[in-house]
């Protein structure tokens, strides 16, 4: 009889687990705008990964993972979100170089020069640091800084390291536009004139051709006019929602993962990453961006803040990297309120391209994409705060 009672109790508890609604879907039902997106989830190519975080008695994080329409084989353009692993591997390579005897840190001064002719003299022999380049990427997603970092690590280094760490859906095939210097191969040297960049003779590795939906749209804007035919993304950069969030988890909680599935980073590197990821645009050296009208304090945060240009509560920190291009908008973030202890991971992408034309810069970002990402994160945050 006792065994029967235990069996019935187990079945009841198991049924309760199955009956619990996916919190992602539940959060979208609480808002009319989100509900409308939910009804058209396939049109908007939504993919969402959400991880609840609780703490055990020792304060260690306990993850509970949820997904909505996540499919690693369905392509979406990662845009600037792929800059996060570029930065991670920049720090990784700095440590590799230091192990060979080169005296270098993220704060070290470096010489960045162009391999082109005198017409680009303005870019020759400029002195900066990896810290400044990385800060500019996190604060305003600077493309030139990102492309310099790509030439520092090299495509092969990036793609090989991603596979070694278990991220098999993340590939780097090209640099970022718009950038007036996108075709320049940058040479990076130490102040001792040691060449440390890896930009020459790089072989790019294209995304697995088994990937689905590599062609998007019905038309494309080309040479000043709309021409028929889908845009082919087969040679573009590639990532997945799962890879993005798992990379971020290793940055926020590196001790929760096996060393062979993390990166060659030290404690200072992780602190450095977390600091700059969580900055609002005008914080620290970001004060220099106040003179440019297109920027605002929450410019680099789709989640929680959206188009609200004023940061209203700095107790809520968003450790993230956003991306937006070709109709795709993405945010990949660890969100934490240091006052009430609410914390979670959220990674989401949405595709908005009503006229089905690629490259015409008419993508409903402000009308649909950014409001979706901000409202989704706010709804999930509210549920956790109850």
Enumerate the language-model features and the residues they cover.
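Bacterial Sec-dependent N-terminal signal peptides
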Residues: 1-24
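Structured C-terminal helix/loop/strand segments within mature extracytoplasmic catalytic/sensor domains
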Residues: 19-35, 226-386
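Active-site-adjacent helix/loop patches that line small-molecule binding or acyl-intermediate pockets
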Residues: 21-33, 124-253, 257
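A short, well-structured edge-of-sheet supersecondary motif
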Residues: 29-70, 346-348
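Residue-level preference for non-acidic, small/hydrophobic
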Residues: 83-90, 137, 162, 244, ...
């Amino acid at each position: 009889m006792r065994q029967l009672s235990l069996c019935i109790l187990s079945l009841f508890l198991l049924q309760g687990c199955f009956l619990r609604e996916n919190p992602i879907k539940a959060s979208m039902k609480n808002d009319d705008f989100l509900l409308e997106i939910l009804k058209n989830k396939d049109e908007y190519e939504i993919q969402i990964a959400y991880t609840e975080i609780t703490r055990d008695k020792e304060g260690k994080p306990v993850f509970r993972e949820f997904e909505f329409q996540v499919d690693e084989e369905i392509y979406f353009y990662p845009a600037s979100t792929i800059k996060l692993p570029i930065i991670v591997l920049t720090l990784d390579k700095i440590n590799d170089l230091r192990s060979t005897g080169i005296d270098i840190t993220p704060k070290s001064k470096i010489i960045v020069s162009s391999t082109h002719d005198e017409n680009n003299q303005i870019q020759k022999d400029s002195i900066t640091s990896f810290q400044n380049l990385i800060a500019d990427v996190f604060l305003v997603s600077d493309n030139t800084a990102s492309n310099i970092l790509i030439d520092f690590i090299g495509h092969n280094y990036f793609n090989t390291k991603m596979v070694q760490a278990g991220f098999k859906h993340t590939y780097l095939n090209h640099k970022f536009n718009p950038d007036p210097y996108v075709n320049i191969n940058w040479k990076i040297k130490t102040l001792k004139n040691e060449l440390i960049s890896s930009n020459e003779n790089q072989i790019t590795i294209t995304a697995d051709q088994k990937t689905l939906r590599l062609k998007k749209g019905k038309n494309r804007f080309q040479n000043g006019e709309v021409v028929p035919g889908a845009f082919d993304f087969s040679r573009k950069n590639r990532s997945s929602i799962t890879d993005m969030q798992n990379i971020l988890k290793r940055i926020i909680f590196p001790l929760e993962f096996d060393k062979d599935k993390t990166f060659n980073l030290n404690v200072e590197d992780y602190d450095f990453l977390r600091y700059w990821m969580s900055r609002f645009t005008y914080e620290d050296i970001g004060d220099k961006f106040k003179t440019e009208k297109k920027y605002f304090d929450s410019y680099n945060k789709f989640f929680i803040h959206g188009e609200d240009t004023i940061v209203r509560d700095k107790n809520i920190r968003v450790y993230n990297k956003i991306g937006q291009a070709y109709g795709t908008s993405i945010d990949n973030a660890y969100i934490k309120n240091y006052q009430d202890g609410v914390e979670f991971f959220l990674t989401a992408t949405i595709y908005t391209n009503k006229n089905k034309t690629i490259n015409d810069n008419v993508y409903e970002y402000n009308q649909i994409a950014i409001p979706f990402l901000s409202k989704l994160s706010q709804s999930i945050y509210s549920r956790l705060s109850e």
